[in-house]
Amino acid sequence: MVQQTNNAENTEALLAGESSDSGAGLELGIASSPTPGSTASTGGKADDPSWCKTPSGHIKRPMNAFMVWSQIERRKIMEQSPDMHNAEISKRLGKRWKLLKDSDKIPFIQEAERLRLKHMADYPDYKYRPRKKVKSGNAGAGSAATAKPGEKGDKVAGSSGHAGSSHAGGGAGGSSKPAPKKSCGPKVAGSSVGKPHAKLVPAGGSKAAASFSPEQAALLPLGEPTAVYKVRTPSAATPAASSSPSSALATPAKHPADKKVKRVYLFGSLGASASPVGGLGASADPSDPLGLYEDGGPGCSPDGRSLSGRSSAASSPAASRSPADHRGYASLRAASPAPSSAPSHASSSLSSSSSSSSGSSSSDDEFEDDLLDLNPSSNFESMSLGSFSSSSALDRDLDFNFEPGSGSHFEFPDYCTPEVSEMISGDWLESSISNLVFTY
């Protein structure tokens, strides 16, 4: 190894000396080695017509000026340092050819022109046809052609076996790289599609999100969550009130300005509670996605049936005069009487919490209201409020559906006492609500 490096250094020194001496060195090199036109070695081989024909009959191209010069110089380097690798010799020859002056290249250019004319005379029908490699180049060319359809097979075959394998590897790499991108595309899409629905259902948790059908999920608004509590103008509120009867589970009057459009508050005398009160969902348009939140109120199911009455089968006009009526906020407000065109089936669902037991509180109504409002799913349709024999069973079922952390942001468990309920349902709230609703 040391001897090889020493030989390389000696060769470099020799070549550097030749290039530094410019003309003299070149003349010395030319004098020491046979001239391009001499017949000693290169000239004789070039003059022989069979020098460019291989044993298989393939005709080689005529040499250019660099090939003529490099053939002479390569033989010199190989004689001086036989252990030097052929690639290293070619690298050094290329650098030296670039450093040669044009005047020094003239004799080799003339020799190359002479060889070209001789080649034309010897082979008049010659046409450059690169030979396709049969052994290893075929597989490389096939794989490269599949990876790069625009690449010609001649170009691949012209390269060496190593280059062909590198081309094939590059083609395979190019074809395999888009595959992970394509595979990760559905993941990104699925995550971006799936996440908004998970974020849009804060109250139901994973159970409510899983119970949504695609049609009901399509009805969910994709905008900001504040669009649920959209404030209506008086002109927009008038047709909404005239097209559907006014009845809903009224929530406690926290944030009344935010919720005044979503629900119509029913305050008034006890005797008026026996009048028919229909659900808003009876005539609400199920195809309107915002109707679920604005017109439909808490009791609007996707098929338009009313879920507003807590227990329509167990409610009675006599029970509506019990003190539980104040806790349910279900008496009619004198300022907004229900229209006479209420549906007949809605008259059976009187005051929302009329027959509730004394243990039930206003927070149950609030929980039920927000749960139905944020989860218009088929589970609540099957859990239709008229199918329960008593409101206590409904309370138990609603309490069972609520889990910690899955309720809406309107939960106030501290205000569950009857005293607070009576305070909230007092007469002072009626005037403030009516002012908020009708005074803009």
UniProtKB/Swiss-Prot annotation:
Pfam family, one: HMG_box
Gene: Sox4
Keyword Coiled coil on entry: no
CDD domains: HMG-box_SoxC (cd22029)
Extent of the signal sequence: none
Gene Ontology biological process terms in this record: ascending aorta morphogenesis; atrial septum primum morphogenesis; cardiac right ventricle morphogenesis; cellular response to glucose stimulus; endocrine pancreas development; gene expression; glial cell development; glial cell proliferation
A GO cellular component annotation in the UniProt record: nucleoplasm
Subcellular location: Nucleus
The entry's DNA-binding region: 59-127
Quaternary structure (record): Interacts with UBE2I. Interacts with HDAC1; interaction inhibits the transcriptional activator activity.
Record-given protein name: Transcription factor SOX-4
Organism: Mus musculus
Note: May be involved in the T-cell immune response in the psoriasis-like disease which is induced in mice by the application of the TLR7 ligand Imiquimod to skin.
Post-translational note: Acetylation at Lys-95 by KAT5 promotes the transcription activator activity and is required during myoblast differentiation. Acetylation by KAT5 abolishes the interaction between SOX4 and HDAC1 and switches SOX4 into a transcriptional activator.
Record bears the keyword Coiled coil: no
Record field: compositional bias (Acidic residues): 363-372
